[in-house]
Amino acid sequence: MKPRILIAIHYMHLGGAEISLIGMLQALDPNKVDIDLFVYSHEGELMKLIPEYVNVLPEIPAYKMFERPMKEVLKKGHLSVLFARMKAKMRMKSYLKKKQTIDQSAIMGFLGEEMSKVVPDINPSVEYDLAISFLTPHNFVRDHVRAKKKICWIHTDYTRIDVNAELELPVWDSFDYVASISPDVTKTFLQIFPSLTPKIIEIENILSSTFVRHRAEEFEVDWSKIGGGNCLRILSIGRFSEQKNFDNLPFICSLLIEEMKKLLSIGRFCEAKNYDSVPDITRRIIESGCNIKWYIIGFGSDESLIRQKIAEAGMQEHVIILGKKSNPYPYIKACDIYVQPSRYEGKSVTVREAQMLCKPVVVTNYPTASSQIKDGIDGVIVPMDNENCAKGLAEFILDTEKQQHIIEYLRTHDYGNVEEVEKIYSLIK
């Protein structure tokens, strides 16, 4: 009989953790393991990418209410969930007052503890060989899954968020293993939880170069038809004749569009990704003499803030929010430079995907940047403050020789790592 694995995650919206989960599912061999996937709420663009051999467990209503609006929770009669979430919010309010902070990161710890008291077990008739909690809070897999071994994942830089270590340590410590996605993520995590050192196992985000390249070919992106108006409007009047040369206008316009550099960023619209700084950075780049448009794919709570910053900077023609895209890879393929302007990261999935598509990558110097980018070799690291970030980006935009050097390097290196799945197999031998 094959070993049986359960993996739990909130939903399958477009995000780094969710994309890396798809990579893991695609890498796992159905001839070696049986896989059950428990998605709290069956929503998100990536649901359709779950391989057919993965058994997606039915939704459990109480778990589906984990992140739904409180009015919806009440309307659907989940009173125990409602009270658990209210209690978590009250505990969080008291915690913030005591710590004198406004950082809401610790809320997941309170939500996990309170909701775990009221939700039912997950597929209780089965004892799994391995249970994987892919996103915090990890309480649900700890308390409501029967398994011989359990492992939970770290996806971010824990020194950049507020952590209630006293509350969270017992949860992390209850697992057999704690999976970290990079050495730098391990280092920052152990600064908060040094006693967990023996439990750490490093498993990078699993990504397939073949999959990314295949998806990038699904359609062509026509930038001339995408938002933001035009930087230059041209009018010609005359008879449609050979003398007027109007038949060459499409070619001439294509040359004008090519002169404008297309920057792209992908990710959730949240404080960590720093997209609220993009309009000011863009303004500074344009003032330096570069003609650019910066496109952003994603969604999230900071969208209104980003749009406000775009208006304040007068960058409506140059910073274009594209929203959610179920397949962002053709956009990566079609851009000139991929930019990750984050305040902090674990190990960016989209940076590696851009490298797989041989795109020059620029990242800000967040603490874990050097674990992913060899500065000047397979990408460029620029300062995080807006002024120097813009300066570094502008210099790179103008340095086509350096861009080409990086592209050539990327073409000769494979950034896929499906072999990482062997580390998961080793846990169930």
What are these regions (language model features)?
Residues 360-364:
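Short hydrophobic beta-strand element within catalytic cores of glycosyltransferases
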Residues 56-57, 258-260, 307-323:
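Nucleotide-activated donor-binding/catalytic signature segment of Leloir-type glycosyltransferases, i.e.
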Residues 353, 366-376, 380-381:
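Short acidic/histidine- and often glycine-rich active-site loop of Leloir-type glycosyltransferases
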Residues 375-376, 380-387, 395-400:
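Conserved acidic donor-binding segment of nucleotide-sugar-dependent glycosyltransferases
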Residues 402-417, 423:
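A short, well-ordered alpha-helix in the C-terminal region of glycosyltransferases
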Residues 162-164, 190, 206-230, 241-244:
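Acidic anion/phosphate-binding donor-loop and adjacent secondary structure
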Residues 324, 343:
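Aromatic "clamp/platform" in nucleotide-sugar-dependent glycosyltransferases that forms part
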Residues 149-155, 159, 174-217:
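Donor nucleotide-sugar binding/catalytic pocket of nucleotide-sugar-dependent glycosyltransferases
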